[in-house]
Design a protein with these regions (language model features):
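N-terminal Sec-pathway targeting helices
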Residues: 1-13
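Short amphipathic alpha-helical "recognition" segments used for binding
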Residues: 8-10, 40, 178
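Hydrophobic h-region of N-terminal signal peptides that target proteins for export
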Residues: 15-24
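Boundary at the C-terminal end of the N-terminal hydrophobic targeting segment
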Residues: 25-30
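Short, His- and charge-rich active-site/binding loops that engage polyanionic ligands
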Residues: 33-95
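Domain-level detector of nuclease and nuclease-like folds
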Residues: 77-221
Length: 221
């Protein structure tokens, strides 16, 4: 084998090693954790969940006595070091925005408490968290009361800035599937200080969310 060929082979092997190392680091960045009412796929480098998944059901919303909202934001006990993020949020002006909403666990104390784990939080501008994001949460619960079961996925992408160990995402998304009607809805919100402009103005085709998030959405038959 000629010296020149050996050099090309060595270079090729080095490039492959770099590629595999990069892919390995990328794969290890996220971890999926299952809790009682939701599962979260958390990015350790970004400090926010890239995907959270759960069901909203009529049975889970209707009970004689609703549980008391916990309001204690704490690290996820299954990922304590990476989700010890309270100091990152303090004094920064961002809401600790729920992905899986506490109100979706109105009848389950454990699920309500688990909704306040930082593995379920995203740094959202108050205008989004208390505006269109909240409106969509309420609309989803209304749909569950009417149609019994709704499957929900949501997450965030990108980075505007860093606050401590937490990235403030550029956009937050949500996908909703109504089991009874087999209807899909997808929404994409810019994470900024603009006032709410209505859900219709943020509705997008499902494939847009699949492209930006890297996830495929389907229902297990």
């Amino acid at each position: 084998m000629r010296a020149k060929e050996k050099v090309f082979i060595i270079i090729g092997l080095i490039l492959l090693l770099i590629l595999f190392t990069f892919l390995g680091v990328k794969a290890q960045d996220t971890i999926t954790i299952k809790h009682k009412a939701y599962s979260t796929t958390f990015s350790k480098s970004k400090g926010y969940p890239v995907k959270v998944e759960w069901w909203v059901t009529k049975a889970g919303l209707t009970c004689p006595i609703k549980v008391k909202r916990n309001d204690k934001f704490i690290p996820d006990p299954k990922l304590i070091n990476e989700t010890d993020l309270q100091s990152s949020y303090t004094g920064q002006g961002f809401d600790r925005g729920h992905n899986f909403p506490a109100a979706d666990a109105a009848c389950d104390q454990v699920a309500n408490e688990e909704s306040f784990y930082f593995s379920n939080m995203t740094a959202q501008y108050p205008a989004l968290n208390r505006g269109d994001w909240k409106e969509l949460e309420m609309m989803t619960r209304e749909g569950a009361l009417k149609d019994d079961s709704i499957h929900v996925w949501c997450g965030s992408v990108g980075e505007i800035k860093k606050i401590g160990k937490v990235s403030v995402p550029k956009q937050c998304w949500k996908v909703i599937h109504t089991k009874k009607t087999n209807e899909w809805l997808a929404f994409l919100f810019d994470n900024n200080q603009d006032k709410a402009d209505g859900l219709k103005n943020n509705e997008v085709p499902l494939n847009v969310i699949e492209q930006i998030s890297g996830f495929k959405f389907y229902i297990n038959k």
